[in-house]
């Protein structure tokens, strides 16, 4: 697995200055830089994809550590185009944050940034640029894969709600889980992924983690619940019912 160096508060000033200087040379004008919080609904990407390993790491750090290093954007009218921080902006949007800290570069009156089409952050897709060896980070990546998978199936964006779900409200969607897989989990460190139907949450990723939480005597497990603005009937619900799966105890450990 390659080494990933994420942006930090310590090097933000240097990164912003470097980007601003490059644009000033290209456009032959002086830019102003303002630090503020901007609405994510007005933030648009300038890149075509997200790196799989970096995205998983950013996802983990935002959830676990409230990683909030400002992104760098250029303002064009009422829109903001990301120059540095696509992964941070994408994850915050998926987690349903409304704003993000940003260093905003602005052109003087009479000068504008190049014309660029507006694309939704949600439309960015992961590109497999490097394998992930770390098992914990790989589990975070699987949650993102689940989101992409369901977006491809239903052709709508999905978002993630971080919640604590009671184990009694979980419904498995696979009949078997290997005992070795459960035993390998010493502590439940990664949220499960699930969808809600009625009062129940159907597990999409994290069966072994859920069973381990039960073995540890926990009543709740942290979960990322997939949400969409569209009304969706999840086929996985009917599949679970057809297999006779209604509670964690219905899983056969092999």
Predicted regions and their residues:
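Long, compositionally biased intrinsically disordered regions enriched in Pro/Ser/Gly
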Residues: 240-245
């Amino acid at each position: 697995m390659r080494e990933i160096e994420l942006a930090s508060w310590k090097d933000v000033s240097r990164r912003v200055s470097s980007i601003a200087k490059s644009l000033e040379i290209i456009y032959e004008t002086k830019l102003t830089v303002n630090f503020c919080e901007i609405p994510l609904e007005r933030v648009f990407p300038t890149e075509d994809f997200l790196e799989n390993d970096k995205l998983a790491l950013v996802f983990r750090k935002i959830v676990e550590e409230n990683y909030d290093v400002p992104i760098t954007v250029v303002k064009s009218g009422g829109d903001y185009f990301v120059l540095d921080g696509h992964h941070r902006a994408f994850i915050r949007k998926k987690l349903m944050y409304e704003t993000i800290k940003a260093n905003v570069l602005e052109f003087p009156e009479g000068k504008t940034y190049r014309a660029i089409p507006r694309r939704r952050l949600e439309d960015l897709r992961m590109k497999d640029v490097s394998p992930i060896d770390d098992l914990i980070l790989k589990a975070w990546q699987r949650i993102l894969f689940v989101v992409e998978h369901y977006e491809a199936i239903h052709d709508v964006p999905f978002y993630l709600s971080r919640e604590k779900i009671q184990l009694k409200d979980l419904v498995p969607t696979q009949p078997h889980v290997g005992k070795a897989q459960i035993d390998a989990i010493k502590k439940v460190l990664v949220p499960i992924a699930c969808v809600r139907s009625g009062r129940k949450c159907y597990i999409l990723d994290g069966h072994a983690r859920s069973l381990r939480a039960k073995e540890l005597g926990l009543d709740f497990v942290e979960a990322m619940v997939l949400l969409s603005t569209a009304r969706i009937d999840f086929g996985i619900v009917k599949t679970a019912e057809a297999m006779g799966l209604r509670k964690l105890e219905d899983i056969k450990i092999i």
